[in-house]
């Protein structure tokens, strides 16, 4: 039943062409197990396993996952690394403006609002200069990110949504064998 639940809850992810998951969370983590089963339930899903995260970024680029599961700290590190790489000068200011624009874009989408032409142009500009680089660090085929294990800061979820990586959040208890909800 957990496999059926996983494929139903995450149907958009597992119906993606050739879904690929690179898993580094322990399988004792119920959402990791759940999302792994969603991949396996797909006709052509592939799951890769990492024993630790020491080589995570090169492994992401070589494995080319279509979605990634992590705990909030992983996504905080991705954001902080991108911010740090941008630096303190004009690139740093550009990154901060792009990050705020991504969060605003996500909030507008969530509220069902239409962006203005100026907002659309700004978003496309940041796509070309910032967003594709952040996504590229997670692998060239990444389409979704999933988070479980602890509450994720809302602004961080909006950042990933706004750069074109829908954030799936899982909630549940290991004792129940599966997440209670995935949004």
PLM segments and residue spans:
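Active-site glycine-centered loops adjacent to acidic/histidine catalytic or metal-binding residues
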Residues: 26, 149, 172
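Phosphate- and divalent-cation-binding pockets in alpha/beta enzyme and binding domains
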Residues: 77, 97, 155-156, 177-178
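Active-site loops of AMP-binding adenylate-forming
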Residues: 152, 161-165, 173-183
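Conserved AMP-binding/adenylation subdomain of ANL enzymes
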Residues: 3-23, 27-131, 141
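Residue-level signal for inorganic ion chemistry
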Residues: 68, 149, 160
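Alpha-helix/helix-capping structural signal
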Residues: 73, 150-151
């Amino acid at each position: 039943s957990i496999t059926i639940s996983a494929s139903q809850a995450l149907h958009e992810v597992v119906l993606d062409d050739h879904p690929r998951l690179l898993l580094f969370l322990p399988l004792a983590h119920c959402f990791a197990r759940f999302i792994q089963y969603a991949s396996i339930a797909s006709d052509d899903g592939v799951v890769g396993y990492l024993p630790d995260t020491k080589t995570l970024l090169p492994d992401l680029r070589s494995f080319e996952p279509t979605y990634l599961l992590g705990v909030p700290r992983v996504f905080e590190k991705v954001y902080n690394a991108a911010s740090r790489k941008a630096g303190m000068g004009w690139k740093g200011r550009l990154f901060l403006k792009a990050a705020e624009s991504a969060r605003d874009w996500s909030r507008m989408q969530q509220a069902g609002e239409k962006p203005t032409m100026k907002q659309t142009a700004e978003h496309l500009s940041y796509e070309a200069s910032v967003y594709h680089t952040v996504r590229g660090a997670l692998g060239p085929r990444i389409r979704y990110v999933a988070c479980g294990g602890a509450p994720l800061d809302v602004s961080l979820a909006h950042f990933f949504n706004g750069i074109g990586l829908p954030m799936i959040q899982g909630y549940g208890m290991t004792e129940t064998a599966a997440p209670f909800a995935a949004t």
